[in-house]
Amino acid sequence: MTVGYLRPTRILVDQNAIYENIQNELKHLEGTDTVIFPVLKANAYGHGLIPVAEAAQAAGAAGFCVALLDEALALRRANFTEPILVLGITQPSEIELAAANQISLTVGSLEWLQEATAIAQQVPYLHPVPIHLSIDSGMGRIGMRDEAELLAAYTFIKAHSDYFDFEGVFTHFATADDPDDTYFKEQSARFNQLMTALPERPRFVHVSNSATSLWHAACNGNIIRMGISLYGLNPSGNAIPDLPYPLKQALGIESELVFVKQVAAGTKIGYGATYEASEGEWIGTIPMGYADGWLRRMQGSTVLVDGQRCEIVGRICMDQMMIRLPKRYPVGTKVVFVGKSGDDEITLQEVADYADTIHYEIICDLSDRIPRVYTGLNEH
């Protein structure tokens, strides 16, 4: 994708915020042998894979989690040597590539192991691939669901140690960010029950996503898969406001006015002519649209200009949008979508609430054509 370096729209990423969020989690873990594997999937939740990995490494991350083998390989190409776990299912045909790059893979079934073995047997001098067995304790996504499945996979791995190294076992909680912990406790009990069936504990046993580490720390295994909290966002949204330590939001979004005009009452704005000026108004145009991730449902929300709230009027276009200004502002005036201006601030949570979604979706929808600008890490 072509990156729009020559227009004024920018995503601002504070690497120092990422550093501080990890440091605070490490303090939260003091006295334990638990380590942090930041979750860097989806371009580090839209923040930028390599710069976030650099900040996490500087802060003391012991390894990384990603969703795709491609993401793991990108980290290896950038000379990161820490352990990397692919949380999604990788095609068995890629076992040689994973082995050659010392990348740990998630396995959810005996069938995967059998297919991967048939491929591995054709590869001379294959280094054993580190395997993390996934237990489906109630998420309903991937993993072994009962003792028979788990033991069959474990037994197969031990019988084929030339190809596999039993490095870890894990589960994922569906409701760790919910004030009602009933189902969380059911999942936790189910995981512990299945763990007792294993003849040995591998090097890594992990259950904690961001929400689990924040509100159910007693359940922590020895890896925290630090996802959304790494980026300074509350996993629960507004549901559980109490946190064991402050989270510092790492991402901001800014642009500039590129066109300003005064319109008369009755003037219509945007596709579908859905907005009509009720009186004489100043209208500003911003070079950002739904192709950049600011979706059409954000019509009617506000941005900040000179510390003042300005409504998005008319339908958001693919590459541009219009706002109603309180007065004439010159072309080049800064516009804040996420961040502070004057005494006011727009948070990602506010944006998500308006869009009737979660902040995860807002940041992951941000297009790669918006340049990311990084600050802060040189302070450490």
From Swiss-Prot:
The UniProt record lists the keyword Isomerase: yes
Question: What is the required cofactor set for this protein?
Answer: pyridoxal 5'-phosphate
Among the entry's GO cellular component annotations, what is one? cytosol
Write down which residues bear the modification named N6-(pyridoxal phosphate)lysine: K41
Active-site residues (renumbered): K41, Y271
**One matching Pfam family:** Ala_racemase_N
User: Which InterPro entries does the protein's record reference?
Assistant: Ala_racemase, Ala_racemase/Decarboxylase_C, Ala_racemase_C, Ala_racemase_N, PLP-binding_barrel
- Enzyme Commission number, as recorded: 5.1.1.1
Per its record, how is this protein called by name? Answer: Alanine racemase
Organism of origin is Latilactobacillus sakei subsp. sakei (strain 23K) (Lactobacillus sakei subsp. sakei)
- Tell me the classification of the organism that encodes this protein: Bacteria, Bacillati, Bacillota, Bacilli, Lactobacillales
